[in-house]
Amino acid sequence: MQPLHGNCLIAYARHKYILTMVNGEYRYFNGGDLVFADASQIQVDKCVENFVLVSRDTLSLFLPMLKEEALKLHVHKKVPSLLVHHCTRDIPVFQEVAQLSQNKNLRYAEMLRKRALIFALLSVFLEDTQFIPLLLNVLQPNMRTRVCTVINNNIAHEWTLARIASELLMSPSLLKKKLREEGTSYSQLLTECRMQRALQLIVIYGVSIKRVAVSCGYHSVSYFIYVFRNYYGMTPTEYQERSAQELPNCGSAASMAAQGIFYGTDRSAEGIRL
């Protein structure tokens, strides 16, 4: 089968379990082992019932939740192709994640829940010193992801091109050039990050429009509403009303988001203990 570059795999061994590497090597695991691996190094067709494939897009959403210092690490030339965390108790959500991952026609609330549960599983490995190097090795984040990580860690800050470049240990001109090569700019990414955070605060937490504006770095509520309408095609209030009608049963996803599992908060870096 084709190598799955840019994707990761999470496997859970309920009993003794074997993974086959692409080089023909067999890796043996005991019951209770949770495995995080570079999917391109695993023959995933051998373990369909026991794994969740995490796409590059999902990994790219998880990465900005981490502190920006993590992205200053150099991608290691020698990192393991997989990590193992032995869980002292069963993981009931794993089967649910696996089932959701196999469903190609998920409702919006189900998509949120699947992503939240995947992030929860990924957080198990946060205390492993090899986790971030392996994640970066697989994902090799582009400049867009690095910039968004910096912005999301302090969304209300008055960011400038020079300040972001300083956080990423490069010159403003080099940062501008790299972003241009990726078809974007720091101002565009700043707006995207703030609008995404605004949507989270409005839809998930029900925060007032004035507080959302301040939390997202806007000193003028009217200007915030103007930017929001240009970005989403409707005002914050209109979006809130529409979401309330479309997502009456998303309490589970919202609850997980409030605990810092789905969206980037300081608590998300603490992970969960199993």
From Swiss-Prot:
GO terms for molecular function: DNA-binding transcription factor activity; transcription cis-regulatory region binding. InterPro entries: Homeodomain-like_sf, HTH_AraC, HTH_AraC-typ_CS, Tscrpt_reg_AraC-type_HTH. Residues 145-242 form the HTH araC/xylS-type domain. Residues 162-183, 209-232 bind DNA. It holds the Pfam family HTH_18. Induction: Expression can be activated by RpoS and repressed by CRP, H-NS and GadW, depending on the conditions. GO terms for cellular component: cytosol. Keywords: Activator, DNA-binding, Repressor, Transcription, Transcription regulation. SMART domains: HTH_ARAC. It comes from the Bacteria. SUPFAM superfamilies: Homeodomain-like. Homodimer. Positively regulates the expression of about fifteen genes involved in acid resistance such as gadA, gadB and gadC. Depending on the conditions (growth phase and medium), can repress gadW. NCBIfam families: PRK09978.1. This is HTH-type transcriptional regulator GadX. It comes from Escherichia coli O6:H1 (strain CFT073 / ATCC 700928 / UPEC). The gene is gadX.
